C-alpha cells in the first residue's frame, strides 16, 4: 500500500519595519523569496528639517500603515489566513516609530490568530543577504548604516557575535554630518559618494585605526578634521575644495572599513564576507570591497540597494531564522530601542 507524502506547506511571513523613517511591509516565503516588499519613504518630509524628526516619523507611520499592509498582501496575492506568522522590528530604533509597528503587528497577530515574531533590526540587515545568496557558516558581516557600524561574526545560523563596533559616530551619521558641512541637503551620503568618485584629487585626511589589532571604529576625529579643513578655507576667504574633501573623507572611511573587514574574515576563518546596511549602497565602498575581495579570493555578498536601506523583506528573512529555531514571541513583547543583537541570537542548542 502506497503512503502519500504530506505536502510541505511554505512558511509565509508578513513582516513590518518601522524602526526609523521608512514604513515597510513585506510578505516573504521560506525566508528567501520576496513576494512583496512595499516601502513608503519619508525622506522628502524630513529633508526640510535636515534630518529625521522622531515625532514626525511616528505620525507618518500611523498615517500610511494600513494602506501599506493592504498593498503588501495584494501584491503577494496572499490572504491573511495563508500566513504562517506576523513579524515586526522590535528594535533597535526610534522608540515612537518602533511602537507603531509593534502595535500594528500585535493587532494583526490577534485578529488573524497568527504567531508573532519580534525581530532585531540589524539581524534583518544581515539576513537581507539571504534574499540574494545562500549563506555559508562561519561568516563575517560588515554592518554600515546611519546608526550602526559593526563587524558581526556568525559561526552558526542565527548566532551573532559582535567583534567590532563604532566608539562614537556610526559611518552613516558621519557621512550626513560631513555632507551638511559641505552644503549638501539631507540625506547627504549619496551626494558625498557621487562627488568623491568625480573628484580629480583627494584632500589628505587621517585614517583612524585605534589600537593595534582592534576591530572597533571611530569617525568623530575624521569628521572634526573635515570641519577643520572647511573652516580654515573660509577663514582665508577661500571656497573649500568640496570635491577634494569629499574624496578624501570617503577614501579614509572606505580604507579603514575594508581593511578591518578583510582582517576579521582572515582571523575568524570566515567563508564569506557579507555587506549590509544603508551605507552598503555607497558606490565607493562597494567597488573597493569587490576589488579587494577578488584579490584576496574571498566570497563577497552584497544585496541590491533596495535591500540595503530599511525594508521589511529583510525582517521577514531574519524572522524566518528565528521561527525555525525558536518559534514565536509572546504577545506582551515591547518595543526595545536598545535591543541587543547578541541576546536576540537563536539558542545554540536548537542548531545542534
List the model feature ranges, each with a label.
Residues 2-11, 119-140, 318:
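Conserved phosphate-binding catalytic cores of ATP/NTP-utilizing and phosphoryl-transfer enzymes
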Residues 8-92, 125, 245:
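N-terminal beta-alpha supersecondary unit
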Residues 23-28, 141, 149-153:
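Short beta-strand scaffold segments in enzyme catalytic cores
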Residues 82-128, 133:
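Glycine-rich phosphate-binding loop and adjoining helix at the ATP-binding site
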Residues 118-119, 273, 290-314:
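Conserved phosphate-binding/catalytic loops in two-lobed NTP-binding clefts
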Residues 123, 156-198, 223-224, 228-232:
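Glycine-rich phosphate-binding loop plus the immediately following alpha-helix
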Residues 194-273, 282-296, 323-326, 343-352:
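A contiguous, well-structured pocket-lining segment that forms one wall/lid of small-molecule binding clefts
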Residues 303-341:
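Glycine-rich phosphate-binding/hydrolytic loop that grips phosphoryl groups
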Amino acid at each position: 500500500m502506497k503512503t502519500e507524502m504530506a505536502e510541505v506547506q511554505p512558511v509565509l511571513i508578513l513582516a513590518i519595519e518601522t524602526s526609523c523613517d521608512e514604513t515597510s511591509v513585506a510578505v516573504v516565503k521560506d525566508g528567501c523569496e520576496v513576494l512583496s516588499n512595499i516601502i513608503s519613504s519619508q525622506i522628502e518630509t524630513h529633508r526640510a528639517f535636515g534630518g529625521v524628526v522622531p515625532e514626525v516619523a511616528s505620525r507618518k507611520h500611523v498615517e500610511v500603515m494600513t494602506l501599506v499592509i493592504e498593498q503588501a498582501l495584494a501584491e503577494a496575492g496572499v490572504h491573511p489566513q495563508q500566513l504562517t506568522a506576523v513579524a515586526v522590528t522590535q528594535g533597535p530604533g526610534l522608540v515612537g516609530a518602533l511602537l507603531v509597528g509593534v502595535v500594528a503587528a500585535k493587532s494583526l497577530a490577534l485578529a488573524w490568530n497568527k504567531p508573532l515574531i519580534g525581530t532585531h533590526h540589524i539581524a534583518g540587515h544581515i539576513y537581507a543577504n539571504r534574499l540574494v545568496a545562500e549563506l555559508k557558516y562561519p561568516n563575517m558581516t560588515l554592518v554600515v548604516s546611519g546608526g550602526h557600524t559593526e563587524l558581526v561574526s556568525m559561526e552558526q545560523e542565527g548566532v551573532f557575535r559582535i567583534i567590532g563596533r563604532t566608539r562614537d559616530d556610526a559611518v552613516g551619521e558621519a557621512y550626513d554630518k560631513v555632507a551638511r558641512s559641505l552644503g549638501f541637503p539631507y540625506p547627504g551620503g549619496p551626494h558625498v559618494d557621487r562627488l568623491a568618485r568625480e573628484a580629480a584629487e583627494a584632500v589628505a585626511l587621517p585614517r583612524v585605526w585605534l589600537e593595534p589589532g582592534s576591530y572597533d571604529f571611530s569617525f568623530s576625529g575624521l569628521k572634526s578634521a573635515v570641519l577643520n579643513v572647511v573652516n580654515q578655507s573660509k577663514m582665508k576667504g577661500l571656497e573649500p575644495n568640496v570635491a577634494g574633501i569629499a574624496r578624501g573623507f570617503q577614501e579614509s572611511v572606505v580604507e579603514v572599513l575594508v581593511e578591518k573587514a578583510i582582517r576579521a574574515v582572515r582571523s575568524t576563518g570566515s567563508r564569506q564576507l557579507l555587506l549590509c546596511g544603508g551605507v552598503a549602497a555607497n558606490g565607493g565602498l562597494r567597488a573597493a570591497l569587490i576589488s579587494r575581495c577578488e584579490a584576496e579570493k574571498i566570497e563577497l555578498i552584497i544585496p541590491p540597494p533596495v535591500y540595503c536601506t530599511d525594508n521589511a523583506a529583510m525582517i521577514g528573512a531574519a524572522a524566518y531564522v528565528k521561527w525555525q529555531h525558536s518559534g514565536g514571541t509572546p504577545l506582551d513583547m515591547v518595543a526595545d530601542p536598545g535591543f541587543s543583537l547578541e541576546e536576540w541570537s537563536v539558542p545554540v542548542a536548537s542548531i545542534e
